[in-house]
């Protein structure tokens, strides 16, 4: 029987399945950070259990860390406790930890792929909703809750029901300057923020195949923002070339054998999906969100929509509420909306290609008066590479702040946050009310679009800046 990629991955990991019972899946990789793990480790202690396969669990610090100093006390008492607990727990249970002073420390979804922890064909979980990022490798990756974190630590398995399948095909080639972030925002604009609920999404089409691995990670990172359980891109030569030679990747003949298997990880001809969505890549322009969920998004050249234009009463009410919170009026061109802060970073857009794209816009320009702009690399290796390429100097000379790795202003769990009423052009993944700070107003954009907003002081079409 013809199978989708998701069905192949799921079936390959079923440990036990009985009639009328939820299947038990084997978990190949478990990624851990400081926020969702303390209670899970305490649960192990309470029951006298060990981590079943510590070599398949990798930990880092990211959510709470300061991006201005490596001092563990810098982000407040709760953050200090969570980070100290992670150090204690990893030492006690034999889990590898990339702590604040480790050269590989960084955002968990940047660190995993970078170190070859993430490989095609795997099941990967983490107590974080953006675990879908790793689906870019043709891995079944999804976020789990703290009680599930404990279950995986103790058993290396997890009960999971089968999801519905969705194919999202982006046909043709994207125009120059259109990034993975623009593509995925355009997709969510079409599906809505709940359009993928109950599904695992496979992204395909020429525009997807043309993306680098970093672009595919941006794409899959935001699968959760359309309500999907996970996102997938079938592995190909782009994938294999990225993985080759990384720290935890197979070596020599083992790598060749792995590639032979990975090449089978694709949807069979004749396999059927529950839902199919199609977009034309050539029609996608630079995207900017205007509301308080990622589905409230338009092209930078568009005017802010009138709530009355939505036929669905729920969408209309949501648009009215969003405009009120965002302090915007319908009919205004997005390019007339001024910003206060810019955040370039997060597990969506903090990799080296993202920083290069932003630096290309920043080079030779200055951050607009009254704007604070942060650039936060996703990991120690990304920071080191950016500095080796001189990107830090470009940013600093332009008036951007060059920070240490961490989740930073993506979420208000550390010192980087918006003040009430401040408006931010952000390369992160969520624009919910208060996500970047109480009363903060978040607009999601690509790294180049964020840099353009920083140097102009308002949203600007990057196609007119180059």
From Swiss-Prot:
InterPro entries per UniProt: 3-IsopropMal_deHydase_lsu (IPR004430), Acnase/IPM_dHydase_lsu_aba_1/3 (IPR015931), Acoase/IPM_deHydtase_lsu_aba (IPR001030), Aconitase_4Fe-4S_BS (IPR018136), Aconitase_4Fe-4S_dom (IPR036008), IPM_dehydratase_rel_enz (IPR050067), IPMI_cat (IPR033941)
Cofactors: [4Fe-4S] cluster
Entries under CDD domains matching the protein: IPMI
Enzyme class: lyase
Domain of life per record: Bacteria
Pfam family, any one: Aconitase
Keywords: 4Fe-4S, Amino-acid biosynthesis, Branched-chain amino acid biosynthesis, Iron, Iron-sulfur, Leucine biosynthesis, Lyase, Metal-binding
Cofactor binding notes: Binds 1 [4Fe-4S] cluster per subunit.
Annotated GO MF terms: 3-isopropylmalate dehydratase activity; 4 iron, 4 sulfur cluster binding; metal ion binding
Quaternary structure (record): Heterodimer of LeuC and LeuD.
Function according to Swiss-Prot or TrEMBL: Catalyzes the isomerization between 2-isopropylmalate and 3-isopropylmalate, via the formation of 2-isopropylmaleate.
Protein name: 3-isopropylmalate dehydratase large subunit
Organism: Klebsiella pneumoniae subsp. pneumoniae (strain ATCC 700721 / MGH 78578)
Gene name, Swiss-Prot/TrEMBL: leuC
């Amino acid at each position: 029987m013809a199978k989708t990629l998701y069905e192949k991955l799921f079936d390959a990991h079923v440990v036990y399945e009985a009639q009328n019972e939820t299947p038990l899946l084997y978990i190949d990789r478990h990624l851990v950070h400081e926020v969702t793990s303390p209670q899970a480790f305490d649960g192990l202690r309470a029951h006298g259990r060990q981590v079943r396969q510590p070599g398949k669990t990798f930990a880092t610090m990211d959510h709470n860390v300061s991006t201005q100093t490596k001092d563990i006390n810098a982000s407040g008492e709760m953050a200090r406790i969570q980070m100290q607990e992670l150090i204690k727990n990893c030492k006690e249970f034999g889990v590898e930890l990339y702590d604040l002073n480790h050269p590989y420390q960084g955002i968990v979804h940047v660190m995993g792929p970078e170190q070859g922890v993430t490989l095609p064909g795997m099941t990967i979980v983490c107590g974080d909703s953006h675990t879908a990022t790793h689906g870019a490798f043709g891995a079944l990756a999804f976020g789990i809750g703290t009680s599930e974190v404990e279950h995986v630590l103790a058993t290396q398995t997890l009960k999971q029901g089968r999801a519905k399948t969705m194919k999202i095909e982006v046909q043709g080639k994207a125009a120059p300057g259109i990034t993975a972030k623009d593509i995925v925002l355009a997709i969510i604009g079409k599906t809505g923020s709940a359009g993928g609920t109950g599904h695992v999404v496979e992204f395909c089409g020429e525009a997807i195949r043309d993306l680098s691995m970093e672009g595919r990670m941006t794409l899959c990172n935001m699968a959760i923002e359309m309500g999907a359980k996970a996102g997938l891109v079938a592995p190909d030569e782009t994938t294999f070339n990225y993985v080759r030679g990384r720290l935890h990747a197979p070596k020599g003949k083992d790598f060749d054998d792995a590639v032979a298997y990975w090449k089978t990880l694709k949807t069979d001809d004749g396999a059927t999906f529950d839902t199919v969505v199609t977009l034309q890549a050539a029609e996608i322009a630079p995207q900017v969100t205007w509301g308080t969920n990622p589905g409230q998004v338009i092209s930078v050249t568009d005017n802010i929509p009138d709530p009355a234009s939505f036929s669905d009463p729920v969408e209309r009410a949501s648009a009215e509420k969003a405009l009120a919170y965002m302090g915007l009026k319908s009919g205004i061109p997005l390019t007339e909306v001024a910003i206060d802060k810019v955040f370039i970073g997060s597990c969506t857009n903090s990799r080296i290609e993202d920083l290069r794209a932003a630096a290309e816009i920043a080079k030779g320009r200055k951050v607009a008066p009254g704007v604070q702009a942060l650039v936060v690399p996703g990991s120690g290796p990304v920071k080191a590479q950016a500095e080796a390429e001189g990107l830090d100097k470009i940013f600093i000379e332009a008036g951007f702040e060059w920070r240490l790795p961490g989740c930073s202003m993506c979420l208000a769990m550390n010192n980087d946050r918006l003040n009430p009423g401040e408006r931010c052009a952000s390369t992160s993944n969520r624009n919910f009310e208060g996500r970047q700070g109480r009363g903060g107003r978040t607009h999601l954009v690509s790294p180049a679009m964020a840099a353009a907003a920083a140097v102009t002081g308002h949203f600007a079409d990057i196609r007119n800046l180059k």
